[in-house]
């Protein structure tokens, strides 16, 4: 998916994957139905199974269009900002995990490490600040993802504040790219100070690094 305007050609799939019932995860492939259609195409549609994850790359630079907010709303971006050195590794046997088992691990993490009410209250405050200062908002979709993501991050050995730092930087602050940031450097500095007051001075590292990058590039 190394192409610009990912929200155009992947929009239908994104909408389908957000439907609550898996039996609704059907993608229209063809309008005409033939007797010799492939066996997995029924009535011109293909059923998407629950063991499929979509991973792809999109260009986001001066030569392409800006990535739409709804892409960041639905996906978790992983930035490739540095070049890794080549390395050799030993062959290791594969580990097979069923989708049911993986989903059970996710559910167990939510029971064992739920996001704290204190953190939810802080996120509500940040949301109100961002709405007032930048006319942007988290939205219910992102808040649901935070509730799902934070427990799994903690179960993997991280902390609550690290998980919130990552998800806010990747999903909320990315929306700032659509603003006229050249005229908002003072507001960005004030927001940095606000994060220090709300979460602590030595926390929210990814968010503050990204804000500094925005100020530098605009």
Predicted regions: what they are:
Residues 1-218:
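C-terminal regulatory/interaction module of P-loop NTP-utilizing enzymes
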């Amino acid at each position: 998916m190394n192409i610009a305007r990912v929200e155009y050609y992947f929009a239908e799939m994104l909408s389908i994957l957000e439907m609550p019932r898996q039996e609704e995860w059907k993608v229209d492939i063809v309008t005409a139905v033939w007797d010799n259609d492939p066996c997995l195409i029924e009535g011109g549609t293909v059923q998407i199974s629950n063991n499929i994850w979509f991973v792809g790359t999109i260009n986001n630079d001066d030569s392409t269009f800006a990535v739409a907010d709804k892409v960041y709303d639905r996906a978790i971006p992983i930035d490739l900002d540095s070049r890794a050195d080549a390395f050799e590794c030993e062959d290791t046997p594969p580990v097979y995990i069923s989708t049911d088992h993986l989903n059970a691990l996710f559910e167990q993490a939510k029971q064992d490490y739920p996001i704290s009410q204190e953190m939810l209250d802080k996120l509500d405050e940040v949301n109100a600040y961002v709405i007032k200062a930048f006319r942007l908002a988290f939205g219910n979709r992102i808040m649901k993802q935070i509730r799902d993501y934070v427990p799994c991050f903690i179960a993997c050995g991280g902390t609550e504040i690290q998980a919130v730092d990552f998800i806010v930087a990747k999903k909320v602050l990315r929306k700032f790219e659509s603003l006229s940031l050249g005229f908002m450097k003072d507001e960005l500095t004030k927001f940095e100070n606000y994060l220090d007051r709300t979460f602590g001075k030595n926390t929210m590292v990814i968010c503050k690094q990204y804000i500094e990058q925005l100020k530098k590039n605009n």
